[in-house]
Amino acid sequence: MSNITIRNFGAIKKHSDPIEIKKVTFFIGNQGSGKSTVAKLIATFMWIEKALFKESYNPQWFEKNNTFRDLFLSYHRLENYLKEDTYIQYTGSAFSITYTKGQLSFEKKEMAYALPQLMYVPSERNFISYMKSMRELKVASAALNDFLAAYTYAKEKVTEIPLPINESYLLYDKNRDILYVKGDDYRVQLSEASSGFQSLVPLFLVSDYLVNSVKNKTEPMSIEERKRFEKQIKEIYANPHFTEEQRRSAANALSEKFNKTSFVNIVEEPEQNLFPTSQRNMLYSLLKINNEIPANKLIITTHSPYLVNYISVAVEAGNIQNKANKEQIRKIIPISALVKSDDLAIYQLNEKEGSVELLDNYGGIPSDENFLNNEIGRTNELFADLLDLQ
């Protein structure tokens, strides 16, 4: 299992235990506590591991002075979060990567590795719903640009697909390059739809497109990747020392370095602008996508107590699915959205302490004693205090 340890980076001051990156991982906490920072670092180190596995770059290139800061951290605008005593260690299936004293170092691992399709879904995604290109934005992060590229590919595949909220559908008019949201008695352009749709549609559309591209192996190689793949294939078949069986084996091993076999979906605040029941349906749609391939991972940063409570429902349903009638469970939650208790980790971040702590669980169910639920309880206390003044 992958994990990451972070010390003295941005808002994160201390974290003694590695953060385990499970099939479903949540980060909750106040604004400025470092939720997105942790998620972005996970995305960054997973990308480096993937590049090393594919031999897109050699380790010496990554070890050059300031490459990590100026190229990789700047992608997510994290370059100024580095400190003199920053320590980060990421352990994946293919490589262990350590940043300390201003340098990256690598250790190759001999474990099965599912080459991932990585996607970071930024919180600014709702801009995309009413802008056709990043040229229309004066300032855009590299992450948002890449998300827009995936969104552009994804919408080209759409004719009409169901959305997970409001019993609605998404339609695409290719001639006019316009997306529409359609219900029983309405059809509106996405650019004129509610803010909830403008936030949800890019997230759902790209997630659905990418998981299907991995399942169906339709995600194209880049021009550079294809050139490198073809060159190495030619070298394999031109090698006079290989038998035919060895050539086939080497070609299959090479293909594994280029064919993606998992989808890692890293989503900032998926609850944006959504009513609680829509948050639930949105979450269940992401869990369904996550469950479509065994090696998939879903990483979420959130302020929403509803999402934490709904994921608890998914875990409890997963715990009892062998003991209860599936039809009865299906009336409560889609079977496709169930989560095994061992596949979930929820971390709380404390901006005052700069800490990251794993949320306790009871019988695999996340504890109710978390920052988000505690704030709901606090409103009851405040109301009771006011009643005492009457």
Say what each PLM segment does.
Residues 1-174, 253-254, 292-295, 308-309, ...:
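P-loop NTPase switch/coupling surface
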Residues 91-98, 121-260:
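Extended helical coiled-coil dimerization/tether regions that scaffold
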Residues 265, 296-306:
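Conserved H-loop
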Residues 268-270:
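Walker B catalytic acidic pair
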Residues 275-276:
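Conserved D-loop-proximal element of ABC-family nucleotide-binding domains
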Residues 281-286:
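Conserved hydrophobic alpha-helix in the ABC-type ATPase nucleotide-binding domain
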